[in-house]
Design a protein with these regions (language model features):
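Active-site beta-loop-alpha junctions enriched in small/polar residues
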Residues: 158, 187-189, 324, 350, ...
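Conserved N-terminal alpha-helix of the aminotransferase class I/II PLP-enzyme fold
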Residues: 41-90, 115-122
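PLP-dependent enzyme catalytic core of the Aspartate aminotransferase-like
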Residues: 9, 80, 121, 130, ...
Length: 428
């Protein structure tokens, strides 16, 4: 199948299984619930382990259900290869660990998911990898923060929880000038609304648990290799360019070519630490992927109507959504998201924690839980939950106030959502 000639809505249904299953003629992708695979002979086994034959070796590394999912997400993002793992957190961790060692450094936007902030601020430093967090509103901050030992710049297409937007092309240019890759989390953006690789990003990560799965039922993460970054020419990434002593002495840039980055994660990090996605979860996430465009269109449509409702409500102090003309990222929103975006955003209730929690506790349709991007509408109070590990200064720097509430707008009928929001606000 010549995927470049097909539209997104077709690719999300067919890539990876262009023909029915060869063993059963099944149209749906089968769940290959197996741990291991039979080699034809000793030479065949050696070729698989030596990466001369790209087939399955062991269930911790590859699975045919997983393979279809990986190929499909990679095609939708415009990348050369994908790797599915057990969670979005695992995807981010592997993406950064793959090209860093003790003594290395990362530059990250500070307006990111609290779990990723914690990884960069507390967990990775225990392994000798430090991070400088910068205010992405001033692009010069990225340039100033890059050091000789910096190995990556990390951002999100839409920040969590406030859906701030960063000039991807400008940050990519800065990173490439210093011969380092731009890694971007496109969980909130989705490849339907934006394909960061087309704007200069080198590696894309997702929590597939969110919009890709879409129904809050299965954990999963994906790493997509853009295939354009020249790891050898950079001279900063011996992990990919020199003989690997724990994998037959191969050079990943030679053995895997444009897919060297994700191939090393699969061959080394996934092999040794095992954050493997289950075949069943890969199947469930594939099911979600097939309706991604339809769901995201409805998410965005509903979100814009909720924003319009909230900005006029007397008990709302502020709405943080880039579609609003007064939002500081509105121009970037129009540039990078011509079809709209940000069904996950925050607003500020007048008062503080007490008022915000009163509003949340009186919602009837919105579910209070630690997830987003479900077809069901969700709500949470970031300061006391998802970002509770941050101190007051860090919360302020990320734009999270005592009265901040995060909404994830689902696909219910918009009239029902507006009625629910109105009655809960009336309880304050």
């Amino acid at each position: 199948m010549e995927t470049k000639k097909l539209h997104f809505e077709t690719l999300q249904l067919h890539v990876g299984q262009e023909q029915p299953d060869p063993a059963t003629d099944a149209r749906a992708v089968p769940i290959y619930q197996t741990t291991s695979y039979v080699f034809r002979n000793s030479a065949h086994a050696a070729a698989r382990f030596g990466l001369q034959d790209p087939g399955n070796i062991y269930g911790r590394l590859t699975n045919s259900t997983q393979g279809v999912f990986e190929a499909r997400v990679a095609a939708l993002e415009g990348g050369v290869a994908g790797l599915a793992v057990a969670s979005g957190a695992a995807a981010v961790t592997y993406a950064l660990e793959n090209i860093t060692r003790a003594g290395d450094h990362i530059v990250s936007a500070k307006t990111i998911y609290g779990g990723t902030y914690n990884l960069l601020e507390h967990t990775l430093p225990a392994y000798g990898v430090t991070t400088t967090f910068v205010d992405p509103a001033d692009l010069s901050n990225f340039e100033k923060a890059i050091q000789e030992n910096t190995k990556a710049v990390y951002i999100e297409t839409l920040g969590n929880p406030n859906s701030n937007i960063i000039d991807i092309e400008a940050v990519a240019e800065i990173a490439h000038r210093h011969k380092i890759p731009l890694i971007i989390d496109n969980t909130f953006g989705t490849p339907y609304l934006i394909r960061p690789i087309e704007h200069g990003a080198d590696i894309v990560v997702h929590s597939a648990t969110k919009f890709i799965g879409g129904h809050g039922s299965s954990l999963g993460g994906v790493i997509v290799d853009g295939g354009k970054f020249d790891w050898a020419a950079s001279g900063k990434f011996p992990q990919l360019t020199v003989p690997e002593p724990c994998y037959h002495g191969i050079r990943f840039t030679e053995a895997a070519g444009a897919a060297a980055y994700v191939t090393r994660i699969r061959a080394i990090l996934l092999r040794d630490t095992g954050a493997t996605i289950s075949p069943f979860n890969a199947f469930i996430l594939l099911q979600g992927l097939e309706t991604l465009s339809l769901r995201v269109e409805r998410h965005v449509e509903n979100a814009l109507k909720v924003v319009d409702f909230l900005k006029k409500h007397p008990k709302v102090a502020a709405v943080n959504h880039p579609s609003l003309t007064e939002h500081p990222d509105h121009a970037l929103y129009q540039r990078y998201f011509p079809n709209g975006a940000s069904s996950i955003f925050t607003f500020e209730v007048k008062g503080g924690v007490k008022e915000a929690q009163t509003f949340i506790d009186n919602l009837q349709i919105f579910s209070l839980l630690a997830n987003v991007a479900d077809v069901k509408s969700l709500v949470i109070h970031p300061a006391t939950t998802t970002h509770s590990q941050l101190n007051e200064q860090e919360l302020e720097e990320q734009g999270i106030k005592p009265g901040t509430v995060r909404l994830s707008i689902g696909t219910e009928h918009i009239a029902d959502l507006l009625d629910d929001l109105a009655q809960a606000l009336d309880k304050i």
